[in-house]
């Protein structure tokens, strides 16, 4: 058994005291290597939460070293909301709201982050995670769709409640005919027409269907197109069409049930490996903060736990890039308290003059991606070079925030 029952139960009591609930919508996907343009499996989590300050942490005190996204106020890093480990195992989740049976009176809840941290610490494969779910004492204190990939091509969802789970193997053509599955905030095994995120699911499904028609699914599609999609599948609206003329033309629109939301705190894609590659080439493409006001930073596991400082908590406990992304987010959402999360100023985000916040920061991201892909190509052909990872992170710290500030003329 992965963890003795008495210790697990004691840990639950501690977490119930400290827990920050994930109880808001998320949009997620698991993609088999069979459906990707390079044969590497992918995880996507567009994270929605009440805790908008997120940071990245390196863990090294268990069986496997790993990198994970945590809530900034979680000072002891009890919960991880998406991540990967040195064995090439990656995990994320979306909260579900239709999986519990009507007779489930369990009091403990919202332990998904605890379970995922435990999995990253102990699991190397999809099968390891399944065994962990079986062995852990019940009730688990969860209601979630867990998505996992591993270094052997494994890719699956586990729709999990307090006592049971159902596995969806994304490599099985009978389950995932196109090689991918999507989950928002309901489970396919749960109560019909219950839960949340049906519109977001339809939007994401449309994006994936169009992408697979044109070819294979890439990590770029997952990290660029999905979390930043301004299409609303129910109203047939696309905010990226017919843009306002100028940043001065205030153009507030109702902003609910899009994939990016006011409550979106991060978007992360874990890109796995081919079976002949080192698990250390697993890459976590990470956007801290609102995806339309932040940039993607790639992460790899360094032996000494090095990470970009702009993604780690500083003396305030917050990650500098997340702070900046939230500052820029304030420029595009309504300043009126009772309308704040419901209305977005499209002209401040994008306009025909290309002076919107998103339009100004994209060149910074493009520079990062160009540098990262060049490094990855080299490492995949000749092996990972530890010192080059550290140099890349140093370059990120030296340039990214400075370049964003320069583009937007923000004074430090």
Predicted regions and their residues:
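Boundary at the C-terminal end of the N-terminal hydrophobic targeting segment
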Residues: 23-25
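Intrinsic disorder/low-complexity signature
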Residues: 4, 16-17, 394
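Bacterial N-terminal signal peptides that target proteins for export
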Residues: 2-10
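Bacterial N-terminal signal peptides
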Residues: 10-19
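C-terminal, well-structured catalytic/ligand-binding subdomain of enzymes
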Residues: 27-78, 82-84, 89, 93-121, ...
């Amino acid at each position: 058994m992965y963890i003795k029952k008495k210790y697990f139960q004691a840990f639950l009591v501690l977490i119930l005291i400290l827990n920050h609930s994930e109880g808001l919508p998320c949009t997620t996907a698991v993609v088999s290597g069979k459906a990707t343009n390079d044969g590497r499996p992918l995880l996507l989590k567009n994270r929605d939460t009440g805790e908008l300050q997120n940071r990245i942490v390196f863990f090294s005190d268990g069986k496997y070293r790993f990198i994970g996204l945590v809530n900034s106020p979680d000072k002891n890093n009890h919960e991880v909301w998406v991540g990967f480990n040195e064995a090439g195992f990656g995990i994320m989740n979306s909260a579900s709201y239709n999986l519990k049976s009507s007779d489930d009176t369990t009091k403990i809840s919202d332990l998904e982050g605890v379970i995922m941290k435990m999995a990253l610490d102990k699991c190397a494969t999809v099968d390891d995670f399944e065994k962990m779910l079986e062995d852990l004492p019940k009730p688990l204190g969860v209601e979630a769709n867990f998505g996992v990939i591993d270094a052997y091509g494994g890719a699956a969802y586990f729709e999990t409640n307090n006592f049971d789970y159902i596995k969806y193997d994304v490599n099985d053509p009978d389950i995932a005919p196109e090689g991918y599955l999507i989950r928002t905030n309901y489970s396919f095994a749960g109560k019909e027409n219950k839960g949340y995120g049906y519109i977001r699911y339809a939007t994401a499904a449309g994006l994936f269907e169009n992408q697979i028609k044109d070819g294979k699914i890439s990590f770029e599609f997952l990290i660029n197109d999905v979390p930043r999609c301004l299409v609303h599948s129910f109203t047939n609206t696309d905010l990226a069409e017919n843009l306002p003329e100028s940043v001065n033309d205030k153009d507030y629109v109702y902003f609910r049930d899009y994939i990016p939301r006011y409550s979106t705190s991060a978007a992360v894609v874990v890109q796995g490996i081919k079976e002949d590659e080192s698990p250390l080439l697993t890459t976590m493409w990470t956007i801290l903060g609102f995806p339309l006001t932040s940039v993607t930073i790639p992460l790899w596991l360094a032996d000494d736990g090095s990470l970009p400082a702009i993604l780690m908590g500083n003396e305030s406990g917050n990650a500098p890039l997340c702070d900046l992304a939230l500052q820029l987010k304030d420029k595009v959402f309504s300043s009126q308290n009772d309308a704040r999360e419901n209305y977005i100023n499209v002209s401040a985000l994008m306009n025909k003059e290309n002076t919107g916040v998103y339009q100004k920061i994209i060149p910074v991201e493009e520079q990062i991606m160009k540098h990262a892909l060049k490094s990855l190509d080299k490492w995949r052909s000749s092996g990972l070079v530890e010192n080059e990872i550290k140099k890349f992170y140093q370059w990120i710290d030296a340039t990214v925030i400075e370049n964003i500030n320069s583009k937007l003329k923000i004074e430090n």
